[in-house]
Structures are given as structure tokens and as C-alpha cells.
Amino acid sequence: MLRFWRTMAAAAALAASAHGADAQTPVRWLSQTATVHAQYPAEIAAMERVTASGAGLRADRSEFMVLGLNLADALRLVRSGSYDVVSTQVGLASRDDPFLEGIDLIGVSTNMNDLQAAVDAYREIFDKRIGERFGAKVLAIWPFGPQVFFCNQPIKTLDDLKTLRVRSFTPSMSKLIEALGATPVSIPFPEVYPSLQRGVANCGVTSPTSANTGRWPEVTTHLLPLSVSGSIQAHLVNAAWWAKLNPQQQEAMTRELRQMEKDLWALARTINEDATNCSIGKEPCAPKPHVKYTMTLADVAPADLERVRKISAELVLTEWATRCERAYPNCKQAWNGTIGKVRNLTIP
């Protein structure tokens, strides 16, 4: 923990060094995207619009990877005020509060339309919980896209995952992997490529675009496009910093991040088909941001879809609710009345 705070202080000092003395209010923005990512242009465009809005703001960008920060620490970083705006993978950050993972539990919302409805239903209580627990406000919620299986050995159905080591990044994903007879391995995204290369993991779960831009097809051979979630991300702002902004500045930030959210949802609905095409060597395959490979694509069996749905309903939801209720006694009721309602699911 001491190492975390030392690293955080050094990173914050680095971010602050570029501020200078001018009339604009700096927005210390910590991002998880890099130039290779399909989501990078949309976030950069939002930052440029904030700076050009005339509201007296200047977006100063830093990256988790460049600074050596852990994405799972995002909530602590925004709560501490080390950064004003922080983006994070919600499932990773939920180690600090299981309630947050409820927005995208494995097997609940496995296509973009269902996921959008779930996010819209959960947004208000998600934002409220973020405010109560972490002193932050939610400005954008968006997905990377369908989370599917990439393996470095033949895989045709979920049965082929038995005994394999599968990279996971959320608690509910690990529960699904265990139920399939595989072993979940928690590995940060930057370390997945060498882990697959060296046999630390046999498979990994991520979106097609993240896998392609992360060069996973160089170390995997088979792709099972069975979506188990949407990998929800969020842009959060420190509430104390937000309160110091004037109404024009708050309006500019809200407007531009809402537009970014819309752009990233639209991207998630389209970019992953191109990424899949590129990974299996099929046209059309846009030259950027993806690279063409020759992976083998498996067909998704209806029985596997039903299997994921059943594991989610009978195991994942109840296990998550048990964890969540320890920290938030109204957790189950809140979920049933929001996402459960729109997805026609009830946690008993």
C-alpha cells in the first residue's frame, strides 16, 4: 500500500508539472487508452473539444501504462484527488466495491442492445454509489464490446476450455471460468501477451478489437466469438474538483463526455466485426487500427449460449449478491429493481 501511495504521488507530480501558469483551469485527465487502441481518437477528440469549448478548461492527458499505474487503482486515484478525471475498467475497479460490477455481470448482457439497456437502468444508482464511496461523479459509461475467447490451442466449444488456464479480469468472469472446468488466471492486460506466449495462460477473454490491437493473434490460434459481457468502462471525475468548476465549465465537461460516450458506444457496435475479420484474415479488414492475421474462427453453438445463461442465473448472480450485500445491504434489491427488471432476471 505504501508503494501505491508513493507511485501515486510521483505520478500526480508529473501530471502537475505541465500545467504552467495561464488563465485556463487544468483538467488532469488519466486515460487507459493508447494510440494503438480504437477508442483513442474518440477520447482525444473529447479532450480537444473541452479545451476549445471557451469555458476556460485545458485537458492535460496522462496514461496509466506510461506512468506505471495499475488500472485497478483508478477509484483510489480519483478519490485522492491526484487526478481530476480518471477512466477505468469497472470490473477491475470493483475490487474496492462489488456493487460496481453489477453493471456488467458475466452472462447477463451479452449483446450491445441488452448492455445499453442495463447501463441505462443502473446508471443513477451506480453514480450515487460512486459518489458515496469514492467522492466522485460519473461522466461517461461505455463498453469495449463483446468479450470473447482467444486460445493458443484448438477450441470449438466451451467444453474445450476444461483444464485450461484462462485469463480473467473480473470476479464474476472468474466464477464462470471455474464453472466451465477451467482455471481463471488474473492477469493485467499489458501482461497477457507474454503470458499467452509463455504458457502461463492458454486462453484470454477480451474484445476482438482489444485483442487485435494488443497483438494477441500472434500468440493465439483459435477464436470462439461467444460473448459473455461487454467490458464496461467509466470516466469519473473527482467530486470536490467538480464542485469548484463554474456552471459553464461543468456544462462543457458534461456535454463533451456525453458525446464521447455516444461515440464509443457506436464504435463498440461496429469496430469489433472489423477486428474479428482482420484476426481471421477475412475481408473487409480496414488497415487501421487492426492488423490481418490467420486465426481459426469457431462457430458458437446454441448449447453454449444456454450454458452461459444458466451459469450466470444460477451461480454468478447469487455469488455476486452475497459478496455485494456484505458491503451494501440493499445491493440485491437495487439490482433486481434496475438491471434485473430490464433483463427479466431476479436474484432470490
Q: What does each of the following model-derived ranges do?
A:
Residues H19-A23:
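Sec/Tat signal peptide C-region and signal peptidase I cleavage site
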Residues M8-S17:
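Bacterial N-terminal signal peptides
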